[in-house]
UniProtKB/Swiss-Prot annotation:
Its EC number is 3.6.1.-. Pfam families: Maf (PF02545). It comes from Pseudomonas syringae pv. tomato (strain ATCC BAA-871 / DC3000). The gene is maf-1. This is 7-methyl-GTP pyrophosphatase. It catalyses: N(7)-methyl-GTP + H2O = N(7)-methyl-GMP + diphosphate + H(+). One of its GO terms (biological process) is nucleotide metabolic process. Nucleoside triphosphate pyrophosphatase that hydrolyzes 7-methyl-GTP (m(7)GTP). May have a dual role in cell division arrest and in preventing the incorporation of modified nucleotides into cellular nucleic acids. The record marks 12, 70, 154 as: Important for substrate specificity. GO terms for cellular component: cytoplasm. It is an enzyme of class 3 (hydrolase). Disulfide bonds: none annotated. Keywords: Cytoplasm, Hydrolase, Nucleotide metabolism.
Length: 192
């Protein structure tokens, strides 16, 4: 079996991949994550997932390289990582009592053959109606400034959701394991 490499510095993705009980290494790719003019959110996450994997291919020959990228989309607009309390509060206020779709791009690159499988896995959450006090309590408790849309679903962020809809709940955290297993099997990896 080729060695697995997770092209990410995300501890959330690392924890998810560890669930598969396959040995893997992690390396953070250095790419430009800018949104291109006219690029749809769906196309953006697929491109970035692929570019993250490709950025490490020359350093890791003989590897299966996993790239992933996620955005939250509200009314057609991308909600990126907020980075600040103020921006996170704005995002959550806008998302109150709406549906937010998380798009997770996934790429599996075989650095030996150059073959790259790419997909986008959607997951939708219906947000509770949130008042400013509950938003601020959540932000102070969870500090989700490195999470798309200010949602840290693997923690207290789940309390913001009224309901969820999607084929793979792990995509909400940033690495759709069901789809990844399909890709790994196609590459001849035995899971479990």
């Amino acid at each position: 079996m080729p060695s697995l490499l997770l092209a990410s510095s995300s501890p959330y993705r690392r924890e998810l991949l560890a669930r598969l009980r396959l040995p893997f290494a992690c390396e953070s790719p250095d790419i430009d994550e800018s949104h291109r003019p006219g690029e749809t959110p769906h196309d953006l996450v697929q491109r970035l997932a692929r570019e993250k994997a490709e950025a490490l291919a020359s350093e890791y020959p003989g590897h299966l390289i996993i790239g992933s990228d996620q955005v939250a989309v509200l009314d057609g607009q991308i909600l990126g990582k907020p980075h600040t309390f103020e921006r996170a509060r704005e995002q959550l206020t806008a998302a109150s009592d709406t549906r937010v779709t998380f798009l997770t791009g996934l790429a599996l690159l075989n650095s030996s053959t150059g073959e790259c499988q790419v997909d986008c896995v959607p997951f939708t959450v219906h947000m509770r109606e949130l008042d400013q006090a509950s938003i601020e309590r959540y932000l102070r408790a969870e500090t989700p400034y490195d999470c798309a849309g200010s949602f840290k679903a693997e923690g207290l962020g789940v309390s913001l959701f009224r309901s969820t809809q999607g084929a793979d709940a792990t995509s909400l955290i940033g690495l759709p394991l069901i789809r990844l297993v399909d890709m790994l099997i196609k590459e001849g990896v035995s899971v479990p």
